[in-house]
Amino acid sequence: MSYVLEGQPIMGTRLTVKDQLAAHPKYFGKFLELMEGSGLFESIHNLGTGNENDNKACGGTNVSLFNTYHYTIYVPSNEAIEQLQKEGKLSSWEQVEADHEAGNTEKATADSLNILNFLKYHIQDNALYIGAQKESGDFETSLINTQTKRFYMLKSALKDDSIEVVDATGATHKVNKSTYVDDSGTKKELYNIQAREYLYDSKDATTATNLYTSSSAVIHLIDSPLSYGN
């Protein structure tokens, strides 16, 4: 789908998922670090045609998993991710690199895949907003079960002032209306954070005048990390 515009593309909100994660480093910083090392961010989108001229420039640094749809991203806090790392349930990219340099390539590969799967499992199809009309159901994540060849699911339900999420292990997690006050004294919300990501109808963003497509996402702080039973 293309949007023909006059002059430069009209972008609307220009804040990508990466922009929004970076805006809340005390809460989303560790998740952002994992995303940055994962290869899930891109500035050029490959359509997979085999023709480089078909590639599309991103309007910013985009999430490569997005595909003209709306998504929910559940972000565990810095402390929650650090706790997983202390318990040996999740590695860091620094540790993966250290293992690789030490010749522990099998461990480095396994830990790298575990990080990637962790991130994908926290990205859900369908944007769910606190305060919207109540909705519940089973929603696909971005993580494929290699045995069934189907996407892992999350059971998510919108409540009056929260979202309840049941993961593959049966554990229930919650998105609350969490807020904090930043260094300037401004109250910031850690739920219903909106992002939109654009693709130009050209591989060169500096000369593009058309938009090819866009995707949107809503980001929430979640009270504990999701698990698919790995």
Enumerate the language-model features and the residues they cover.
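Mature, structured domains of secreted/extracytosolic soluble proteins
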Residues: 1-230
